[in-house]
Amino acid sequence: DSHCGAFAVICMVLLAMTQWSAFLSMEAAPLLPLALIPVASRASAAMAVLSLRPMRTSQYSAMERGGAPVFVAAALLAAACALPIVLWSSFAPLAAAIGYGLAVWYGFRQFEGMSGDISGFGLVLGELCGAVVLALGR
């Protein structure tokens, strides 16, 4: 993309290298905590989209509130984080949820509202946090 800045390219390369390193170093890691990392980050995203104020220019501002309540996403998040802790002593999905939360908190404060871009930013960083914690915790 000709509109992509140099720092965005550098960040993308660093993200890809960190993910590559994390996945390469987790040969003996249990698979269920790895599979629950995206579940935890997506449940966190659902909670954020349903509960945080959207930016005026975001597609979320036109979204009707309703559908699945926030507690459904919260219950899914709690299960996705608790199950690996109890069964494998793995904090990877919890790290993904915390990473997502911190990234969204930062983006929400910077842009004064929630948007799909902020949610995507949080998903990428949250899943990176989960993968790194899984790789380090083996």
Regions found by a protein language model. Give the residues of each.
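Transmembrane alpha-helical segments that form the membrane-embedded catalytic/substrate-channel core
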Residues: 36-51, 97-107
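Solvent-exposed interhelical
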Residues: 43-77, 110-114
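Alpha-helical transmembrane segments of multi-pass membrane proteins, especially transporters
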Residues: 34-38, 62, 92-97, 122-123
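Short amphipathic alpha-helical coupling elements at transmembrane boundaries
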Residues: 1, 61-66, 120, 124
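Transmembrane helix-loop junction
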Residues: 24-25, 50, 109, 135
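Interfacial loop-to-transmembrane junctions
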Residues: 105-129
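Hydrophobic core of alpha-helical transmembrane segments in multi-pass integral membrane proteins
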Residues: 71-89, 93-104
